[in-house]
Swiss-Prot record:
GO terms for molecular function: rRNA binding; structural constituent of ribosome. One of the primary rRNA binding proteins, it binds directly to 16S rRNA central domain where it helps coordinate assembly of the platform of the 30S subunit. Belongs to the universal ribosomal protein uS8 family. PROSITE patterns: RIBOSOMAL_S8 (PS00053). One of its GO terms (biological process) is translation. This is Small ribosomal subunit protein uS8. The lineage of its organism: Bacteria, Bacillati, Bacillota, Bacilli, Bacillales.
């Protein structure tokens, strides 16, 4: 069976693993998922990312991050642009998430970047998701 929305599947897997405090999770690899995983790592939402090559499409292994008292670092994930309703923003309309406490993932012609980076580079694009 083909997957309609692989990005929503990735976000749901991260959300579910985070809720039950799993240390790591695996998901099928794709270029956009790799870019999203790298952003989550650089923004401090996850500990580490590994790419495992197999004979098929490969696997991304995410290592989730928790605070000192085992509190969650990722408190929320929300898919914004969906296959049935795409959401785009111009460079000057890229939204802030929780007044800058969270990030918006923006798919641009320069790849997937955060909302802060999109404002800095003055580029717009498709608003993939919010993470806070």
């Amino acid at each position: 069976m083909t997957m309609t929305d692989p990005i929503a599947d990735m976000l749901t897997r991260v959300r579910n693993a985070n809720m039950v405090r799993h240390e790591k999770l695996e998901l099928p690899a794709s270029n956009i998922k790799k870019q999203i995983a790298e952003i989550l790592k650089s923004e401090g939402f996850i500990k580490n990312v590994e790419y495992v090559e197999d004979d098929k499409q490969g696997v991304i292994r995410l290592f989730l991050k928790y605070g000192q008292n085992n509190e969650r670092v990722i408190t929320g994930l929300k898919r914004i642009s969906k296959p049935g309703l795409r959401v785009y923003a111009k460079a000057n309309e890229v939204p802030k998430v929780l007044n800058g406490l969270g990030i918006a993932l923006v798919s641009t012609s320069e790849g997937v970047i955060t909302d802060k980076e999109a404002r800095k580079r003055n580029v717009g694009g498709e608003i993939i998701a919010y993470v806070w």
